Amino acid sequence: MLKTIKSWILGKRDQETSHLTSHRPSTSLNSYSAPTPKRTRQTAMKSTQGTRDSARQSTNLNPKQQKQAKKIVDQLTKIDSLGHHTNVPQRQRIEMLIRRLYREEIGEEAAQIVELRLWSLEESPEAAQILTMEPKSRKVLITMKLERWIRTLLRGKCDNLKMFQSRYQEVMPFLQQNKMETVMMEEAWNLSVHLIQDIPA
């Protein structure tokens, strides 16, 4: 049963991700430019097949299971829903930064900085929980949190530093209650503020 739900969730997420990215034009950030590897294309084809298989499997779930699976899908795609921007060039720059965060050394460095800062936090159960995770899983979780904060700070039409700072003010009450998330937000700020500063006046 769990395997069926998991397959349905992954298929649904692949389908939504494909919808978000299918019409996105190619772009570049600094000198980064990576062609799509053959292996990636093969993976995409397998993912499409998996989506069709998952759709068939979802019919075997009872209403309660489907409701539970949909709730999990909504949680998994919450990050994607934060990424809708009215400024298309800005959105392209954000997506390129996030791809670099997952694929290049910038992501490794950011995760290491966050990890070191988490070690310095005292009496933070949230930080302690992350630090007890297996290193690979910890890095993935930190990267996902950084992505979420980048999308939160740059959501909507945020094309100048003043608007960027107003986003920060909006989340201040939450950050005052969670030191771990404050560390994540500050690193996301450092990673993404140049996207605002680089926009021509």
From Swiss-Prot:
Protein keywords: Host-virus interaction, Inhibition of host innate immune response by virus, Inhibition of host interferon signaling pathway by virus, Inhibition of host STAT1 by virus, Inhibition of host STAT2 by virus, Interferon antiviral system evasion, Viral immunoevasion
An annotated GO BP: symbiont-mediated suppression of host type I interferon-mediated signaling pathway
Pfam families: Paramyxo_C
Chain spans, region Disordered: 15-70
Comp. bias (Polar residues): 18-34, 42-66
Keyword Transmembrane helix: no
Keyword Repeat carried by entry: no
Cysteine pairings via disulfide bonds: none
Superkingdom of origin: Viruses
Family: Belongs to the respirovirus protein C family.
Protein's name according to its UniProt entry: Protein C
Organism: Bovine parainfluenza 3 virus
